[in-house]
Curated annotation (Swiss-Prot):
It comes from Vanderwaltozyma polyspora (strain ATCC 22028 / DSM 70294 / BCRC 21397 / CBS 2163 / NBRC 10782 / NRRL Y-8283 / UCD 57-17) (Kluyveromyces polysporus). It is a peripheral membrane protein. InterPro entries: GatF. It catalyses: L-glutamyl-tRNA(Gln) + L-glutamine + ATP + H2O = L-glutaminyl-tRNA(Gln) + L-glutamate + ADP + phosphate + H(+). Residues 1-21 form a transit peptide. GO terms for biological process: glutaminyl-tRNAGln biosynthesis via transamidation; mitochondrial translation. This is Glutamyl-tRNA(Gln) amidotransferase subunit F, mitochondrial. Its EC number is 6.3.5.-.
């Protein structure tokens, strides 16, 4: 009787294995590290695809100097070519931010389902906190040392 059950089980496993057998449809597998490196270093898309906007809005020299001063970077004695690069990059960033503000959003979506963690969790009482702390064990994988927070 037991042998018959194992035979039936083996047949089911073999059928399921054959039925769900899969193969690689993505492409040939990598053989050398160079192939992996070449694949990872090849560009598939560029940020400029998504940031090609009208560059009519220019940033003034005063704005560039204020931002450099606020950021703690040197703001005096900067070459004109460097200042021009900073202005162009800042202008592109501001245009991109303005484009983001122009995107229409669906405000009818319930925000409480947009996070993994609940937004309004049930508050814990003091006794529940103490009980959970008492039952918590130190995890050496996370670098927690037993007795490090306990009073001597």
């Amino acid at each position: 009787m037991l042998a018959r059950k194992f035979t039936i089980l083996n047949r089911c496993l073999i059928r399921n294995f054959v039925r769900y057998q899969s193969s690689s449809l993505i492409g040939e597998s990598f053989i050398t590290k160079e192939q992996i490196s070449n694949y990872l270093n090849s560009e598939t898309w560029s940020v400029t695809q998504y940031t090609q906007f009208d560059t009519d809005s220019k940033v003034s020299d005063d704005t560039v100097l204020k931002i450099l001063k606020l950021s703690g970077l040197p703001n005096e004695g900067i070459e004109d070519s460097v200042k021009l690069k900073i202005k162009d990059r800042l202008s592109t960033q501001l245009i991109f931010i303005n484009k983001l503000h122009e995107v229409e959003c669906d405000y009818d979506i319930d925000d409480k389902y947009s996070r993994i963690i609940q937004r309004n969790p049930k508050p814990m009482t003091y006794n529940e906190i103490m009980l959970s702390l008492k039952n918590t064990e130190k995890d050496s994988k996370l670098g927690e040392i037993s007795g490090s927070w306990e009073a001597n």
